[in-house]
Amino acid sequence: MNSSDEEDIALSRLAKKSSSITSASTYEDDEDDDIPLAKKSRKKRVESDYEEDEDEVPLKKLSNGRAKKQVKTETKVKKEPKSANKSKSTSKKDTKVKKEKTTVKKESKATSTKVKEESKTQSDSQASVKSETPEEDQGYKWWEVNQEEEGDGYIKWQTLEHNGVMFPPPYEPLPSHVKLYYNNKPVNLPPEAEEVAGFYGAMLETDHAKNPVFQKNFFNDFLEVLKECGGCGVEIKKFEKLDFSKMYAHFEKLREEKKAMSREEKKRIKEEKEKEEEPYRTCYLNGRKELVGNFRIEPPGLFRGRGAHPKTGKLKRRVVSEQVTLNLGKDAKIPEPPAGHQWGEIRHDNEVTWLAMWKENISDSLKYVRFANNSSVKGQSDFKKFETARKLRDHVDSIRKDYTKMLKSEKMQDRQMATAMYLIDVFALRAGGEKGEDEADTVGCCSLRYEHVTLKPPNKVIFDLLGKDSIRFYQEVEVDKQVFKNLRIFKKSPKQPGDDLFDRINPSLVNRQLQNYMKGLTAKVFRTYNASKTMQDQIDIIENEGTVAEKVAKFNAANRTVAILCNHQRTVSKTHGDSVQRINDKLKKFMWQKIRLKKMILQLEPKLKKKDSKYFEEIDDLIKEDIEHIHHTIIKRQREQAKKKLERDNEKLKLEGKPLLTESDIKDKLDKIDELEKEYQKELKTGKPIVTKNATVEKLKQQIETLENRILNVSIQLKDKEDNSEVSLGTSKMNYIDPRLIVMFSKKFDVPIEKLFTKTLREKFIWAIESADENWRF
């Protein structure tokens, strides 16, 4: 299922840009002569007939309270007939795949490899998709197959078979004693309304539930559901009189019971869940097993939204099979719908790559079940996306030259187009689009309004708007002086707050202009190009020296530059402070251990303090209170570990039907901990740790060296955590930076790929890991 992280607005300034995008014009106080001849009073405009690229069009209504932006167009783009592309598609055989020319190849090694034989076929009469492990078909390495022969037409597959979607379990009514109270009296709710009330009751103490907008939207939808199911015998009029405390207490009890489950119980539940999900996890594409992405229908609940979303708190209604459209091969067996239900529609559309689809009620948009991120379909899509971005390097200079010249065009539409292209290129803005009144007011380039931009002569611009996830974006940047003049013109009277700055263009026209230079070029491709090019430039200036931890920190700094460019912000997590404190505590513990070892050395060789005073100058750095706290933490942790081991052992004994252990059985262990505590207390008084029998100065110095390396690594980790607390590195790494750059860094700098890619990303970008080498260039 698609999850969109494409709604953020990137306005962060690129550190430095090529001089080719800077105009030589100078700022003038009087700019009336600079206004394009085409600029007149605002007239009614006609909408563009140009259709946006499929990936760029949001599945949301574009209308809002203001009049829809209408744009002058001079020509229309003809849509290529399907037949033209269909002829390019190739029929795939399920017998043997010939030895093909490698397309995603290592730049320095011109090698070709054989593709494993595909001998797996699927019977048309098969009752359901087989549930073997997907590893069976992971021998298929699409990146070693000539992509041109694979075809890039309309036909996406020849055969497709799957088991449909997994629905959430039906609602289980609350125990009879758990009630919603209204005006201090219990209310008997119908099951449908009780379920909705329970959604709010379960999150009573969260920040969302305390949000007035959330409360209002929930209450309106709750009353609507109550009305649909015949009411409850009580007239509920005011939200303030509702008491969810009994419901909240019930759900808290369930949460505590879940936490208290034994490891065996949790394991059993997990295994049952995996067994239930197994049939839906895989499908067969052209006879080859592929993993399915999110095969679950979203459960009903209250919509939270990100940032200041106007629909937060609204009810996400339960989806039934009658609302679901399945897409599969004509000869594939249609999965059985839930008992008593039927599918909304069955399609056999091999020009799309989704498996199921339905419409959700919050934004009235379509939701899809698609192939998993590590599937061949998604992998090829990612590869083509980054290859398209790479091709932009052959056109970017001419594009910049043209839009720089067009910044002074006599036509207002051209001048707006050039200014938008400048902002998209230099500051990685999204093209943007109009938002409805009931959508979060996030902004892109074409949807910038009068109030979002403040001008400070001679060439500074302040952007102040809602960016990704409705997080406020505020930044002051320097722009080309001609761009500054143009923005000043775009803001001139009669424009006022609420009016669009770019009232002669829209995202469709911007993408159309870009596609004049290169097939498939859009604002999104430009954004991907700039992100990857910036990462390449940052890697080029990193020195190949230091420890792995130091190299990872340098990599993260480069990644952070890209994230800032793309405005991938995030709010500081609630646990950030605790996490930083834990790292600081770990640093203090290592420091204490190092000082303790140095004190042992001085007990063995007291004269060393004078001979190497610098080496021992830190032995008094920790105050008594810090040392006491470290002692307490160590003892407490050891006791907790002993008790947890006792619990684990008892769980095992219980399953085997053997007598359980008691604390008396671990008395020796607890006694040793008590002895250690006494030793620490004595050490705190005397300042002299007990030296072990076999200790030597050389051995102690080796231990100190090990600790110093740990201290260095943890210090780097702490700085990295602080630097990235408000920046999301993962978004650019997953969507905008060519993964082959990261693989190149891993191999060139001898950093394990596990340090740079999570397990999920390693699976998603296996094609990059196996195809790029240390010399790869974007």
From Swiss-Prot:
The source's domain of life comes to Eukaryota
Give residue numbers for the site Interaction with DNA: 306, 354, 385, 442, 468, 511, 568, 586
Q: What class of enzyme is it?
A: isomerase
Q: Which GO terms describe its cellular component?
A: chromatin; cytosol; nucleolus
**Annotated stretches, region: Interaction with DNA:** 367-368, 430-435, 522-524
Q: Which UniProt keywords apply?
A: DNA-binding, Isomerase, Topoisomerase
For bias kind Polar residues, which ranges apply? Answer: 122-131
* Keyword Zinc assigned: no
Q: Which SMART domains match?
A: TOPEUc (SM00435)
Name the residue ranges with Basic and acidic residues bias.
71-83, 100-121
* GO MF annotation terms: DNA binding; DNA topoisomerase type I (single strand cut, ATP-independent) activity
The region called Disordered is annotated at 1-141
Q: Which reaction does it catalyse?
A: ATP-independent breakage of single-stranded DNA, followed by passage and rejoining
Q: What InterPro entries is this protein classified in?
A: DNA_brk_join_enz (IPR011010), DNA_topo_DNA_db_N_dom1 (IPR013034), DNA_topo_DNA_db_N_dom2 (IPR013030), TopoI (IPR001631), TopoI_C_dom (IPR025834), TopoI_cat_a-hlx-sub_euk (IPR014711), TopoI_cat_a/b-sub_euk (IPR014727), TopoI_cat_euk (IPR013500)
Enumerate composition-biased segments (Low complexity).
17-26
**BP GO terms, sorted:** DNA strand elongation involved in DNA replication; DNA topological change; mitotic chromosome condensation; nuclear migration; rDNA heterochromatin formation; regulation of mitotic recombination; regulation of transcription by RNA polymerase II; rRNA transcription
Briefly state the protein's biological role. Answer: Releases the supercoiling and torsional tension of DNA introduced during the DNA replication and transcription by transiently cleaving and rejoining one strand of the DNA duplex. Introduces a single-strand break via transesterification at a target site in duplex DNA. The scissile phosphodiester is attacked by the catalytic tyrosine of the enzyme, resulting in the formation of a DNA-(3'-phosphotyrosyl)-enzyme intermediate and the expulsion of a 5'-OH DNA strand. The free DNA strand then rotates around the intact phosphodiester bond on the opposing strand, thus removing DNA supercoils.
Q: What else is known?
A: Eukaryotic topoisomerase I and II can relax both negative and positive supercoils, whereas prokaryotic enzymes relax only negative supercoils.
Q: What is this protein called?
A: DNA topoisomerase 1
